[in-house]
Amino acid sequence: MNEEQENEILAISSIYPDSFSEIETIVGEEENDGFEDNDSQYSKIYQVIITPNISCLDENSLEDNNNSNNNNNNNNNNNNNGLIIDTSYDYLIYFKFKYTKEYPSNEPPIISIKATWLQKSDQSILLSHLEDLWNQNELVIFQMISWLQEESIEILNNHYKSIKKFSHYHLKKSLNTQQLNQNQNQFENQNQNQNQNQNQNQNKEKEKEKVPTIYTGQSVTEKKSKFQAHLAIVHSEREVQLVLNQLLSFKKIYEATHNMYAYRFQLENGEINEYYNDDGEDGAGDKMLFTLSKNQAKEILIVCTRWFGGILLGGRRYVHIVNTTKDILNLYNTNSLSQCSLEFN
């Protein structure tokens, strides 16, 4: 441990005397926390127990034992669009960190977040924001603890609100499309003089939707974090959803830390329909969509999958996200998609 690290530990232990602790573990026993150390038999891990600020949540977002099982609470949950926390149970955040040899000069610390109420996707969102806090040659542990204490709940709350709004929008679009298809089928059936078996066969063919071909590019790995881009040629939001569903049907993709995506396609009236989703990797989707727009893509969906390796990359992760997006888009532009893998079709 270098002098800067020692001074930071002294400061953290002084600021948080009741919640700071030092844990000495045998190498191999801490793998579930994402920590590894091949240089010594024992590894020092530090933990700070954080009570997050939940003042940003409204009454419908807070549960307790008195109302968690009644019908009124169920109605409140249905009307709530954000994060829900049961305050009658432990909602603490257990923040663990460990120093790398070159922290803070060239490397960030290794960190992990655990809480009984946090889902895996929640952890990914928080870790993504913590990555943004680290700057070369700057101590960052106190800043990370403060951010988790003051900002983490609000970030998750806003994330859940945006996800539910997006899901409602696509559900509404899907229902409208289904209704139009049903009306069209009824009209066609009334005007067709074919027999019943022919009509049934035609309806089955219409119900059978073909998923656009998914092309997967080469993966890039840095400090155990892996990035891989997937491309599909799409012409509608329905095709976008079919591709996303297909990718997420694979366990490998479903269990990834992030699956951010962006798409652009041209409508019949000539307008461009475009959208992006960060999937917890704040700012990633916007950069992907900018890349599509800059290349004037008009029928493209790109999904970038990231498997977090346990070591913060800071801004480097955006370099890999953008580069994998550019690489697979370049294969499309040069008619070289045959070089891609088709493993997720």
From Swiss-Prot:
The keyword Repressor applies. It is found in: Cytoplasm. Residues 191-202 have a biased composition (Low complexity). It comes from the Eukaryota. Translational regulator that ensures constant high levels of translation under amino acid starvation. Plays a role as a negative regulator of the EIF2AK4/GCN2 kinase activity; impairs GCN1-mediated EIF2AK4/GCN2 activation, and hence EIF2AK4/GCN2-mediated eIF-2-alpha phosphorylation and subsequent down-regulation of protein synthesis. Belongs to the IMPACT family. The gene is impact. Keywords: Cytoplasm, Repressor, Stress response, Translation regulation. PROSITE patterns: RWD. GO terms for cellular component: cytoplasm. This is Protein IMPACT homolog. GO terms for biological process: cellular response to amino acid starvation; GCN2-mediated signaling; regulation of cytoplasmic translational initiation in response to stress; regulation of translational initiation. InterPro entries: Impact, Impact_N, Impact_N_sf, Ribosomal_Su5_D2-typ_SF, RWD_dom, UBQ-conjugating_enzyme/RWD. Interacts with GCN1; prevents the interaction of GCN1 with EIF2AK4/GCN2 and inhibits EIF2AK4/GCN2 kinase activity. Interaction with RPL39; this interaction occurs in a GCN1-independent manner. Associates with ribosomes; this interaction occurs in a GCN1-independent manner. Associates with actin; this interaction occurs in a GCN1-independent manner. Residues 191-211 are annotated as: Disordered. The keyword Iron-sulfur does not apply. Gene3D superfamilies: Impact, N-terminal domain, Ubiquitin Conjugating Enzyme. It holds the Pfam family UPF0029. Residues 7-155 form the RWD domain.
